[in-house]
């Protein structure tokens, strides 16, 4: 609860600046406007907690979000099973207004409150998770909306990458690099990107976050090799304007849970 209140307070302070740089529609989704994403990370200490988090999203939260028109919601866990695996939840919103209205709508949704009661009111002696954190992301202009994999090619591997830059200008340079060639090449070689985003509020700033997908790990590695061999990528790498625009990369391989709509 404290984390959620803190996040809302930061958003309230930053909202005017965000709206100036990324104006958003008040009512309907606009294809010309980038989506916003909440990326939530739950820290767990047992497989029981992982199951409780998954059940909460599957049976309570996702139905409530869908009733608000927010979908698809992605729920993922680390690809190698372990008791301390984190759970990652990706929530797409068409505007900051929609994102900001979520807490009040959940509070007023009696079906949600009833279905989520055991999770929301978990006692100190039997908590549903260790902690969770949230990042607010905004989609790149080069891919403004979340993209679902083709129905006939459901991926079993999702790769979540965070690229951390040493300064704001270096971070913007890396985004430009994506939009000037990396995104089209990734699509062409079969990396099946789900989303690309810049972190507005969250850890490791300035940074960008994106997700690609693949049928399996072997196929995913082959797709990356195709990207690395692409002439456009090699030309971008050699361009001095993009030199040293990433200082650190965080790479996590995920799989969907039974709750996931992605």
Regions found by a protein language model. Give the residues of each.
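Bacterial N-terminal signal peptides
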Residues: 8-22
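Short S/T/G/P-rich N-terminal loop/turn motif that feeds into the first structured element of a domain
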Residues: 19, 24-233, 242-262
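N-terminal secretory signal peptides that target proteins for export/translocation
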Residues: 1-7
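Helix-centric, low-specificity signal for extended rod-like, repetitive segments
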Residues: 1, 12-15, 33, 154
């Amino acid at each position: 609860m404290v984390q959620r209140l803190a996040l809302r307070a930061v958003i309230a302070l930053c909202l005017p600046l965000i709206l100036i740089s990324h104006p958003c529609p008040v009512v309907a989704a606009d294809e010309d406007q980038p989506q916003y994403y909440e990326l939530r990370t739950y820290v767990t200490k047992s497989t029981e907690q992982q199951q409780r988090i998954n059940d909460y999203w599957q049976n309570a939260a996702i139905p409530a979000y869908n009733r608000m028109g927010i979908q698809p919601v992605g729920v993922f866990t680390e690809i190698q099973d372990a008791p301390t695996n984190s759970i990652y939840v990706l929530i797409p919103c068409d505007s900051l207004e929609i994102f900001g209205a979520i807490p009040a709508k959940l509070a007023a949704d009696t079906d949600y409150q009833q279905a989520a009661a055991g999770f929301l009111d978990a006692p100190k002696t039997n908590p549903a998770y260790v902690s969770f954190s949230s990042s607010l992301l905004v989609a790149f202009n080069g891919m403004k909306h979340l993209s679902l994999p083709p129905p006939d090619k459901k991926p079993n591997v999702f790769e979540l990458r965070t690229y951390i830059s040493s300064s704001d200008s270096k971070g913007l340079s890396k985004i430009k690099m994506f939009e000037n060639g990396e995104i089209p090449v990734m699509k062409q070689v079969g990396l099946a990107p789900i989303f690309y985003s810049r972190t507005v509020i969250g850890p490791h700033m300035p940074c960008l976050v994106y997700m690609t997908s693949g049928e399996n790990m072997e196929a995913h590695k082959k797709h990356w090799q195709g990207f690395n061999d692409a002439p456009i990528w090699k030309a971008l790498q050699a361009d001095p304007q993009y030199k040293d625009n990433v200082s650190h990369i965080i790479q996590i391989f995920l799989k969907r849970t039974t709750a996931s709509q992605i």
